[in-house]
């Protein structure tokens, strides 16, 4: 099973082999074009990740944590001097162990697929800090059907 998020189409789909099991609209980070490069840039990452955590009591209804940053994100950042060797090694180790990578590096973290704000406030089209938001009804379905470790592909 895998989740595919197409940023330009604002769409999430859940696939089992060649069969699409579920599809829903998404809202992205407040700066939706381009890959995430650093903490606070408001961008949603692009690349291959995994669901690395599940939160049934998120302040955004429910949440599935995404394993950003992944090795390609970390290697590019190291080459460009945006993270040090220690941060690179920590991220590589987490990826090998299939656990949550460190979310406190200069690359940012805490990227989730989640529901809507619990305070009921209206939100803009793309309003998150870099996460992927769906309706609470869509999040309930996804949370019931998506296991930890599921692949997540985020495309431009």
Regions found by a protein language model. Give the residues of each.
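N-terminal post-signal-peptidase region of extra-cytosolic proteins
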Residues: 1-2, 8, 28-53, 98, ...
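Residue-level signal for tight coil/turn positions that link beta-strands
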Residues: 7-9, 108
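Core beta-strand residues in small-molecule sensory/regulatory alpha/beta domains
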Residues: 13-15
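Short Gly/aromatic-enriched secondary-structure transition segments
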Residues: 19-31
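A short, polar/proline- and glycine-enriched secondary-structure boundary/capping micro-motif
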Residues: 24-25, 34, 74-76
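Exported/periplasmic cell-wall-interacting domains
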Residues: 53-156
